[in-house]
Amino acid sequence: MIYDFEGHTPKIDPGSWVASNAVIIGKVELKKNSNIWFNTTLRGDLEPIIIGENSNVQDGSVIHTDPGLSLIHISEPTRPY
């Protein structure tokens, strides 16, 4: 489910994937090729949350911000060579 909150609509890149029962609220941005898995909640009701390119948030995760603490930014994972 995707929810607007106080005039803020989540920004979801068309190349990202969101599980059918994930919840995304407010000031959340999903970059290209990001994945949000089952039973996950991203609550951007207070401050922004950015999930970077090629990143994923695994099953059952809850990410929420506190007032006045800028943002949460999950960036591309390190890849082994």
Annotate the PLM regions.
Residues 9, 48, 70-71:
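Short, structured helix-loop boundary elements
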Residues 26, 44, 59, 65-67:
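Residues on the solvent-exposed faces and adjacent turns
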Residues 1-33, 41, 45:
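Extended, small-residue-rich solenoid/repeat segments and analogous flexible loops
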